[in-house]
Design a protein with these regions (language model features):
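Mid-to-C-terminal alpha-helical segments outside catalytic/metal-binding sites
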Residues: 1-5, 9, 21-39, 198, ...
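Catalytic pocket-lining loop regions of alpha/beta-barrel enzymes
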Residues: 105-200, 246, 253-254, 279
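Active-site gating/metal-coordination segments in enzymes
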Residues: 39, 47-124, 170, 174
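Hydrophobic faces of well-ordered beta-strands that scaffold small-molecule active sites
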Residues: 3-7, 40-42, 70-72, 97-101, ...
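Mobile, glycine- and charge-enriched loop segments
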Residues: 1-18, 58-62, 66-73
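Active-site beta-loop-alpha junctions enriched in small/polar residues
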Residues: 8-12, 45-46, 73-77, 102-104, ...
Length: 280
């Protein structure tokens, strides 16, 4: 199985570029089918109200009948004070299996990390080249898995990408994806130093061709076992923990796969940031 772990979808409302205007999937799906990609993780386009954008992605997930996974997009500043409830709805009602945060909106916060900890979700955080935050995240939230896309920099900041490789090597909960990584030598170095267990295949579709991005993985010349980890195994391992919450002792398993009970009384004690817990 091949899973593209990084593809945007739906409409934005910013009109400053494709990333916040529209991310149509028609051509992407054709390209993905031709490339042999089986499933895709959808992320909303940039939006001033992610509740709208996430709802559009959730609808696509339902209509796809299992073709799409989804990561709920969180705006660290606009959603402040309500993030626990947003994530609760995203997991329980909409079927999301991870959280997406972009530094373009605002820097990641404890509130986001605490929600990820409770629901055992991976966090895809685009640091836009400022990879030093990985050190703090690894220290403060060693039990939360973070995926830093683009090997740390979509803008090809080679210094940032080299620094991220160091974080991948040193921190068990730090991962990256291959979306838009143009320095193939650095991608090779990431696999060699950090190992194939820390890398996820992603395309940054629908704007980048998923077949072209996938070919980079094949060109790494890995064993079938290591290639499988990058193409699907690592992602499936990272989202498997969502089911552990679903099967927690005091929760009732939902009838819909991938969703967890609406009874969160047993989880609330895990939400450790006392500055925000009182609001829920």
């Amino acid at each position: 199985m091949i899973i593209d772990c990084h593809c945007h979808a739906g409409h934005g409302d910013g009109f400053t570029g494709p990333w916040d205007t529209n991310a149509p999937l028609k051509r992407y799906l054709k390209w993905a089918e031709e490339a042999g990609i089986d499933r895709t993780v959808l992320l909303a386009a940039f939006h001033s109200d992610y509740s709208v954008a996430n709802a559009e992605v959730a609808k696509m997930m339902v209509q796809s009948r299992g073709r799409f996974y989804g990561f709920v997009f969180i705006h660290a500043r606009h959603d402040q004070g309500n993030i626990f409830n947003i994530v609760k709805k995203a997991v329980n009602q909409q079927g999301f299996v991870g959280i997406k945060v972009h530094q373009h909106d605002a820097r990641i916060t404890r509130e986001i990390c605490e929600a990820a900890r409770v629901f055992k979700l991976p966090v895809l955080y685009d640091v836009t080249g400022e990879v030093s935050i990985c050190e703090l995240l690894a220290q403060e939230y060693p039990d939360v898995n973070f995926i830093i896309p683009h090997l740390g920099s979509f803008a090809d900041d080679w210094k940032a990408q080299l620094a991220l490789i160091d974080h991948l090597v040193r921190h068990p909960n730090m991962y990256t994806d291959t979306a838009g990584v143009r320095r193939f030598d650095l991608l090779e170095q990431a696999v060699q130093r950090a190992g194939p267990d820390k890398i996820l295949f992603g395309s940054d579709g629908p704007w980048l061709h998923p077949g072209v991005e996938l070919e980079k993985i094949f060109l790494l010349g890995l064993s079938a076992q290591d290639e499988k980890k990058i193409l699907s195994g690592n992602f499936l391992r990272l989202i498997k923990s969502v089911n552990q919450v679903q099967r927690s002792k005091n929760s009732v398993i939902s009838k819909k796969p991938g969703m967890i009970s609406s009874d969160y009384s047993s989880l609330r004690h895990e939400y450790r940031d006392r500055r925000v817990i009182g609001r829920y």
